[in-house]
Amino acid sequence: MKKVLLATSALTLSAGFASADVSMSGTGGAGVFGAAGADLSVYSGVDLGFALSGASDNGMTFSASLDMGGGQTLDTGDFELDTQDMGTDDNVSVAIGVSGLTITLSQNGVDDLYDDDIAGDIGISGAMGDLTYSVVTGLEDADPTSLSIGYSAGAISGSVATSDEGDASTVTVTYAMGDITVSAESDTDRTGADTSSVTLTYAMADGMSVSLENSEDVNTVSVAYSSGAISVAVEADDATAETWEATMAYDLGGGATFNLGTNEAETTFAGVGFSF
């Protein structure tokens, strides 16, 4: 999972009919990592992103993005290391905005709207009032087609995403009541398996939040606390094969963070990550 934090230095270009901004951003880090009880080993890596955006004199907007990196970077959310390609990615993404529509072109580089396990070549997205919509497809018969619709008004929001690859779909509804948020989800995956879940989250004023999820009779409790530079999170469930994880992050300033984590599978990491 690549997580690139946007924005930093920018260079403004102009060429008669249009102006464009070119920016570079990135993440990276180094530390130690051990999966499933294995000995700790050193990791290091960097993931860089380059983006160009601008507008023509007739109001058409455009953007293009390019990603490159090397080594391995830490994914604290999934307790894993992500391998970064040496050199640039195969696909460059180009997006064009016309009359409220955004059209994205990237060969096998536009994520399917149900999940990002597969991809298409063409993405179209837009909004009508409180509704947002997106379509991802391709020109070849074998290319998947997916559709998503979202709605948000006041305290309530909802979304539907579907893909013809395996007839997968997911429906989510969320309602916020002050410090309490309730969400429900129904999902049919690409193999036809159905799951549903209900999640209740309470955000306290002192930097602590508590979340309880029930999914197919499995309860998951998550507690997160943040104070100043430090953030701590713990999650556990009561599944037949119980799982738990604990993470800590300390903001070192200047875009650097120290991360520490462990889980029931005896996967452990400690390292410094940075963004710019």
Residue ranges and their predicted role:
Residues M1-F276:
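Outer-membrane beta-barrel proteins
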